[in-house]
Amino acid sequence: MKALTARQQEVFDLIRDHISQTGMPPTRAEIAQRLGFRSPNAAEEHLKALARKGVIEIVSGASRGIRLLQEEEEGLPLVGRVAAGEPLLAQQHIEGHYQVDPSLFKPNADFLLRVSGMSMKDIGIMDGDLLAVHKTQDVRNGQVVVARIDDEVTVKRLKKQGNKVELLPENSEFKPIVVDLRQQSFTIEGLAVGVIRNGDWL
């Protein structure tokens, strides 16, 4: 892959962040508006440059016809420390990519999350491990999830009842996190589907 200019990197980051937040790429008009271009045509020129450099594919005839190629080549993105209020898969959180077959996990893994702390050690999730995560909000009680409470991201076992959510640790030294859905912001970022021990698998 050829190196990107600062402006091209900005466009690429916007596309990736938009996909992670909404599930679809932005239109040319949205790119122009977000980055202060005078017209969608200016955004189109940057997209053509990104396509020439092999990081995106432009699908003709569709206003959102942009496909990222980089992740497919590089493997699963590894998410490190997440800044408050930002999308989990925002470009600045991605430490690198691992060549891991997503289909080794059931359901397929969409990204890896670096585990911080020992609150889940009793089920073999240790500090520094890479947690394979399937991006979904369709989860059930008893499953281990990646959750965001207000602006904090955590890995815990889910127990939801009415307007109350308990996020249960798997370590007796830690207390459950209790969330009142009427007062706190709560989002499921994904379902834990496997563990890679301390980055041994590259």
UniProtKB/Swiss-Prot annotation:
CDD domains: S24_LexA-like
Active site: S119, K156
InterPro entries the UniProt entry points to: LexA (IPR006200), LexA-like (IPR039418), LexA/Signal_pep-like_sf (IPR036286), LexA_DNA-bd_dom (IPR006199), LexA_repressor (IPR050077), Peptidase_S24_LexA (IPR006197), Peptidase_S24_S26A/B/C (IPR015927), WH-like_DNA-bd_sf (IPR036388)
GO biological process, one term: DNA repair
Known EC number: 3.4.21.88
Residues within the DNA-binding region(s): 28-48
A GO cellular-component term linked to this record: cytosol
GO function terms (MF aspect): DNA binding; DNA-binding transcription repressor activity; identical protein binding; sequence-specific DNA binding; serine-type endopeptidase activity; transcription cis-regulatory region binding
Effect of deleting the gene: Cells are filamented, accumulate DNA double-strand breaks, have viability defects at 10 ng/ml ciprofoxacin. Synthetically lethal in combination with a priB deletion.
Annotated keywords: Autocatalytic cleavage, DNA damage, DNA repair, DNA replication, DNA-binding, Hydrolase, Repressor, SOS response, Transcription, Transcription regulation
Site (Cleavage): A84, G85
SUPFAM superfamilies tied to this protein: LexA/Signal peptidase, Winged helix' DNA-binding domain
Catalytic reactions of this protein: Hydrolysis of Ala-|-Gly bond in repressor LexA
Pfam families with a match to the protein in the record: LexA_DNA_bind, Peptidase_S24
Secretion signal, residue range per the UniProt entry: none
General function of this protein: Represses a number of genes involved in the response to DNA damage (SOS response), including recA and lexA. Binds to the 16 bp palindromic sequence 5'-CTGTATATATATACAG-3'. In the presence of single-stranded DNA, RecA interacts with LexA causing an autocatalytic cleavage which disrupts the DNA-binding part of LexA, leading to derepression of the SOS regulon and eventually DNA repair. Implicated in hydroxy radical-mediated cell death induced by hydroxyurea treatment.
Assembly behavior: Homodimer.
Family statement: Belongs to the peptidase S24 family.
Protein's name in the database: LexA repressor
Organism the protein comes from: Escherichia coli (strain K12)
Classification lineage: Bacteria, Pseudomonadati, Pseudomonadota, Gammaproteobacteria, Enterobacterales
